From Swiss-Prot:
Keyword Chaperone: no
Subcellular location: Cellular thylakoid membrane
Biological source species: Prochlorococcus marinus (strain MIT 9303)
Membrane disposition: Peripheral membrane protein
Record keywords, A-Z: 4Fe-4S, Iron, Iron-sulfur, Membrane, Metal-binding, NAD, NADP, Plastoquinone, Quinone, Thylakoid, Translocase, Transport
Entry binding sites for [4Fe-4S] cluster: 60-61, 125, 156
Full protein name: NAD(P)H-quinone oxidoreductase subunit K
Record PROSITE patterns: COMPLEX1_20K
Amino acid sequence: MSVTPSIDAVRDLRAASCGPVGAPSVTSELSENIILTSLDDLHNWARLSSLWPLLYGTACCFIEFAALIGSRFDFDRFGLVPRSSPRQADLLIVAGTVTMKMAPALVRLYEQMPEPKYVIAMGACTITGGMFSADSTTAVRGVDKLIPVDLYLPGCPPRPEAIFDAVIKLRKKVGDESVSERIKIAQTHRYFTVPHQMKRVEPIVTGAYLSADTQKAALSPGAGLPMAAELNTSEIDASPASQPSSTYES
């Protein structure tokens, strides 16, 4: 048996449904289906999940990074997609020794990368010059003298697990950035390439020491000693083997 509502109940229902819309209340069901965030968090989340590295390997450290491409470590889960062009990359991984001759090429690759961009210095040779920092005259003592570095990864060479740890720390840095702060920093902390004005230097070792008086005095006691037959140039020049032959044997 149905109950017919009264006229007053119908009027109250019409007034409640046709009145002005009030502020909606966020229920527990709505908060579970909608994520409230900011523009910075959304932008950083998209960037940290799609880091595209440009691999700049010059020595043995790059072999350890090449192991990440295999299925054992599977670095694709971090969104890392290796790129061969600097214009498509936002992460530069420098692995190995950087020499004076390779320094301009490295700086050019960094300048061709779009903003925002990050750099990971991988290995002791990249960070400080490594075992080449003591005696080598061409090794760069630290890649941070050429380009700004965001994260240092020590080791000789670092293991693939250490590279994962470096990527995770870089993702945390990317997630804490702000668009407005990054614009201000870009205006006050700009990176300019320093042109190297190189000039020619005369060689130090020219062979002039052989004609010095001290060298002549050291060689004078052996001036009167007999010379071995094998070192006698006059006999070598007169030998038949040293003369060119005009006939050919078939």
